[in-house]
Amino acid sequence: TVIAPTWFSVSDTNGSLRSFAEASYVEKAHEKGLQVWGVVDDFNYLDDQGNRTDVAAVLASTTTRTALIDNIMNAAAACGMDGVNVDFEKVMDEAAGEDFVEFLRELSIRCRQAGLVFSVDDSVPYHFNTRYNLAEQGVIADYVIIMAYDEHWAGSEEAGSVSSVDYVRYAIEKTGEYVPGDKIVVALPFYTRLWITEGTSLTSEAYPMTGVDALLQKYNMTYDWDDATGQNYAEATDGTTLYQMWIEDLQSFNVKLTVMQNYELGGVAAWRLGFEPAGAWDLIRVYLER
C-alpha cells in the first residue's frame, strides 16, 4: 500500500523545487506499513504574481532538466521516501511532449539506481493527448497511473458523470494498447460533482464522497440507480434552477472495482485521501484479495 503526498512543484525555470517533504512523515508512514511516493507536479506552484512556472522551458534544456532531476533525487534521499511519482499536466504540444519523455527517461534511470519506484500519472488517452506517449511510458516507468476521472470536469460544456463505468472500461482498454497490464494502476475518484443549470448558465462544484448525503438533503434531491453510468443519478428543480449529480458512492466505487477484476492490472489508486467514507477501504481490500 502506497501513499503519494503532493510534496514537490517545479518553482522556477532553473529546475528548482518547492518542497513540503518531511522525513518524519515518511517514518510514520513506514511504521504503518505504507510506502511513500513523493508527487512532483508542474501546476501547483504560483509565483508572487500568480504565474505558473514555464516547465516546458525547464524540460527543453539538458542543463535545467538535469538540475530538476538532481533536486528531486536529493529531496527523495533527504526524506527517505520509497518512490517518485510524476504528475505533469501542462505538457501542451508535441515538442514539449518529446522533452517530457526525455525527462522521464533520465529520471527513471536515476530512480532505478537509487532503488526508488518510478511512476507517472496520466489522463485517459485520447487523440488530443498523444504527446504524453504512453507507449514510451510503458517502457520507462514501473507504473503508469491512469486517472479514470474528470470524464466531465469544471470546464465541461454539459453536465455529466465524473467517472462512469464505461469511461473506466475505456481507460483500461485504451491504456492497455500501449502499456503492459501489470504496469497499469487505475485511479478512481473519491469525489463527485454537483451541477447547477440556471437558464443557459452551467456551473459545477466538486464535493467529497462524504459530502453527498448533505447535498441530497440541502437541495431535496431524489435519486435512482442508472445502469448506463453505474451510478445513482440525483436531481431536483427549484423554480428554474436544475440540480444534478451523478453520485460517486460505495455502490458506484464497487461497480468500477468489479469491472477492473476482468483485467490483469497493476493495482488501484484513488484521488484523494480524506474524501472517502470508511467503507471504501474494505472494498479495495476485497478487490486486492481477489
Regions found by a protein language model. Give the residues of each.
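Acidic/aromatic/glycine-rich contiguous surface patches that form carbohydrate-binding/processing clefts
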Residues: K256-R290
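Catalytic domains of carbohydrate-active enzymes, especially glycoside hydrolases
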Residues: T1-T13, N71-V84, V255-V268
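Substrate-binding surface in catalytic domains of secreted glycosidases
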Residues: D12-R18, D70, E98-K218
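Short acidic, glycine/proline-enriched helix-loop-strand junctions
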Residues: E31-G33, A95-E102, I109, Q113-L116, ...
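Glycan-recognition patch characteristic of GH18 chitinases/ENGases
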Residues: T1-N71
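Short, acidic/polar
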Residues: A60-A78, Y126-A135, I247-Q261
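Glycan-binding loop/region signatures in secreted carbohydrate-active enzymes
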Residues: L46-D47, R52-D54, F190-K256, L288-R290
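Hydrophobic faces of well-ordered beta-strands that scaffold small-molecule active sites
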Residues: V2-P5, V36-V40, V84-V86, F118-V120, ...
